[in-house]
Amino acid sequence: MDFQSDLTREISPQRKLGRGKIEIKRIENTTNRQVTFCKRRNGLLKKAYELSVLCDAEVALIVFSSRGRLYEYANNSVKATIERYKKACSDSSNTGSISEANAQYYQQEASKLRAQIGNLQNQNRNMLGESLAALSLRDLKNLEQKIEKGISKIRSKKNELLFAEIEYMQKREIDLHNNNQYLRAKIAETERAQQQQQQQQMNLMPGSSSYELVPPPHQFDTRNYLQVNGLQTNNHYTRQDQPSLQLV
């Protein structure tokens, strides 16, 4: 019973949408039909975009309004997707038609990439001055302008690097000069300190000039010396009553 009721609801022409039930049939009112078309179209385009992004699917959507206006969406290209669809449908009887269509599609993409690579290689050779026979006068002028523009950029960058290198070397020269002056000052200071130390050691050595010889005393007058001694002797030994020493 439940399955039959569910099936009946699915087959019923009425579906519950939003706030109430909307009967799925042609809308007679032109204004309401246009408003509904815009809303449903935007929702359909949004779903197609989400499907292509989330599932990495190739999606192409084509919609014609009642007035014949075209609306389309494709994550790659509508024409490419249609061509792919035609190729897949033409070989629908064959079990490997889809894989063959995919193979053909990838072959076409590979051929496009090879053509792009060939063009880039030719441009590279032309920039080097090779394979110029197939170029016209206009192509040669365009090539010349590109090369001159490239050379101008290269020279500008080279000069910029040279100026930066010169500025660095000048700064380095100033630093070395300052370091040299500092080292010279330190060497001179060290030499002065050594000289002062040597001078102090020389001054402390005996017999150096700092120790002045004491001048010899005045010469004694021998006559005076003898006279004084004689007088002193007479004074000491004139006394006859001086007791003599006796040994016991």
Swiss-Prot record:
Residues 202-211 have a biased composition (Polar residues). GO terms for molecular function: DNA-binding transcription factor activity, RNA polymerase II-specific; protein dimerization activity; RNA polymerase II cis-regulatory region sequence-specific DNA binding. Residues 196-219 are annotated as: Disordered. Residues 19-73 form the MADS-box domain. SUPFAM superfamilies: SRF-like. SMART domains: MADS (SM00432). InterPro entries: MADS-box/MEF2_TF (IPR050142), MEF2-like_N (IPR033896), TF_Kbox (IPR002487), TF_MADSbox (IPR002100), TF_MADSbox_sf (IPR036879). It is found in: Nucleus. Disulfide bonds: none annotated. Gene3D superfamilies: Transcription factor, MADS-box. Keywords: Activator, DNA-binding, Nucleus, Transcription, Transcription regulation. Residues 103-193 form the K-box domain. One of its GO terms (cellular component) is nucleus. One of its GO terms (biological process) is regulation of transcription by RNA polymerase II. CDD domains: MADS_MEF2_like. PANTHER family: SERUM RESPONSE FACTOR HOMOLOG. Probable transcription factor involved in regulating genes that determines stamen and carpel development in wild-type flowers. This is Floral homeotic protein AGAMOUS. It comes from Nicotiana tabacum (Common tobacco).
